[in-house]
């Protein structure tokens, strides 16, 4: 959590990850209390604080991001950071991150569980439904498509763990575990 990290710690983690070709993650912007605390004590919102300490980038996995503002969304996108979206937890807390805006800004979206459910199909379904609700499109149900959420779960996840060149999509030379899903079963219809 941002409120528990000094700038020195953030830089040390970043430098260690760079040196050893690793990714790193932190839970952030998951409550208004956290954002208010950071503004009160550091004069910056969490993502701005991370940017100040060179913590953002393609190795950085930001879990949650439910309360990011437009400036933070832009920082995450420009830095090619990864947002790990936990739809089950977001639904449980009643606050969904602005996934469409994050995606449009250039952030990679990955899916996570964070303890509410470990059933990947539930994560996918809740992610699809909550993103559609947040979009509030005039023509409901067009975006995202199930394929978009599936890509967040597969290629987004592979990108998050720095393995997108070897897993995450069906391509010649990549490793893959395959399953067959009967989408005609009522509980699996997107």
Question: Predicted regions: what is each one?
Answer:
Residues 28, 87, 182-184:
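Nucleotide-sugar donor-binding loop of glycosyltransferases
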Residues 3-4, 63, 89-90, 144-145, ...:
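Residue-level marker of alpha-helix boundaries and capping positions
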Residues 187-190:
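A short, polar/charged loop-to-alpha-helix boundary motif
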Residues 30, 87-92, 114-116:
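Short, acidic/turn-prone active-site loops that include or flank metal/cofactor-
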Residues 1-82, 93-109, 165:
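Histidine/acidic residue-rich metal-binding segments in metalloenzymes
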Residues 52-59, 100-185:
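His/Asp/Glu-enriched, well-ordered alpha-helical/loop segment
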